[in-house]
């Protein structure tokens, strides 16, 4: 293009020489630099009081590290995110679901905001250092040969640690050197490469200067537009700078940019001034206003107050600059994006200017340490800087390096950002899910479980009302709907090996049967039960039944063990529960579903049944990856066996590589339990769905949601939006699951009574292989 005319050599404008160590980089000005990546805080789900408190903390941090030899740069790099978590699935349904969902997600424009803060230590700002620098120049020492002293390195490392600790609420860490495929790469160089060429890629450590390594794209400057040429494409950029500062600042003035539908780099720098220099600057400004007979006496008084605040160490002063570089693949699109960006930047009252003659300087001023290129700068307070750079963002989750590996699922946030969902928060994967009927809870829980199949876990699903039956069967699992009056296929006396541990369990289980109506047993009867279990273990496997067990007891006593066992024997009113020909819990299957809805209100059957089921499930918690899902778990919590299981396993299952997921319609259901505290404490991942009837006490006081999070759940999020709140630790985000057009998959993820009957009919005709019956199900469902 004709307007593109000037091209520069990297060493002329890029000041970075080499790594001093894994964290520290040396500049040709003798400055040292470290860079931190910051997760940020989600302003969208935080209370105003929380944001104001963070603003004050940030101002305090800036005051604590203030030194005229220190400078800070903050960057927000907004970029397209196209990475989708790839995996293999153990069921064809999960694989097909993922394939369709992936096509939907990669077709959308998702953007992420990467936040960075760079710390620079400039020893030349010290008077003695300036003198040393003068003699160095006299000796014509080459910049690349100047060696930083150990004291300067120690100082910047110390300051970096202070900054990391001060930014704890924001999740900051130092960029470093890392190995990949046997080669060393530099995270700092990758960050700087984005500033130089607007593109992200791996940058290896080399023997040459960092400057020459990171300048891999040609940057050509026109009058108002920058062209960046890469071997495979070209991009265009335009820049804005602040011409006049707003009269007041508040946290979040630039937050509108964080949801913009284009890529950009927002750069800010803050070079600390000494108190003496700050007093001179502010005094000069005050005198100018007085001499000009400025009518705004309130501004003069405000400067008086500011000088007093400066002397009282309520803030520090620094030289600040702000620029915004906007990127597009075509000049026409760039013009559109720049128009939108201008609106966001002027929203806070600042006067901005499109860079033209100063375009090249503005571009290179984005690089930390290029102080002389900052053409548009002004003195502001640390409170102002904390407001202009508040490290606001949206959580994006974690793509790689999770306890079980790659992210479970990619979701879209309310802000159009990607969110890489994981059940695990740290090493704890227990999850609490809460949403009223019709909120989309079932679809989303089952979708996440289908995505979890990529990690090849054993999955145990305790269902209610058979809502997950189609999903379990389609996912290659075995499903056992336990119905009143129908043989359960459960025979505990045949299902367990007669080890000493298991015999103790079986004794207690038999005690449960013979005391179901409130009876008691004598010590002699306890011993009789123990002897009977021992004797039963000597029989052939096929003969180990309740009917056989009864024969070991005295049947002459009207209230004895034999009589009490009678009703549990085959042919009697409860014989269908446990006195079956074989024990078939499907524990050899990787995906198991049980529906116990019929028994939840039948305590007599529920107690021994759950006692046995959860004891057998314990055998699966042996170090393999496992998730245990319990729908409407509050009902199960009425049972002592489940309550004990939940309380113990919630605390210990992570050590055995497992996790639990509890789902319910109302938080009060969980809160009414005696183990409510354990559930809240041991489920760091919590998912809440819209609920117009949400109770403030339940959500805010008991589950510790912020008032803003409660507001979202109660009033802002609608059921139709299919949006929900994910909270992990203190961080939260509003995400959505868009399965529009995927009607076949939705019919599997959320089963209706009609569809469940249809599936069972088809399975009775064609067998249980989902690869065979699932296509027939979709065909018949559509024809209905």
Curated annotation (Swiss-Prot):
Main location: membrane
Protein name per the record: Type IV secretion system protein virB4
Location(s), subcellular: Cell inner membrane
Bridged cysteine pairs (disulfide): none
High-level lineage: Bacteria, Pseudomonadati, Pseudomonadota, Alphaproteobacteria, Hyphomicrobiales
One term of GO molecular function: ATP binding
Stated role: The type IV secretion system VirB/VirD4 is a major virulence determinant for subversion of human endothelial cell (HEC) function. VirB-dependent changes of HEC include massive cytoskeletal rearrangements, a pro-inflammatory activation by nuclear factor NF-kappa-B, inhibition of early and late events of apoptosis, leading to an increased cell survival, and, at high infection doses, a cytostatic or cytotoxic effect, which interferes with a potent VirB-independent mitogenic activity. These changes of HEC require the T4S coupling protein VirD4 and at least one of the effector proteins BepA-G.
Domain of life: Bacteria
Keyword annotations: ATP-binding, Cell inner membrane, Cell membrane, Membrane, Nucleotide-binding, Transport, Virulence
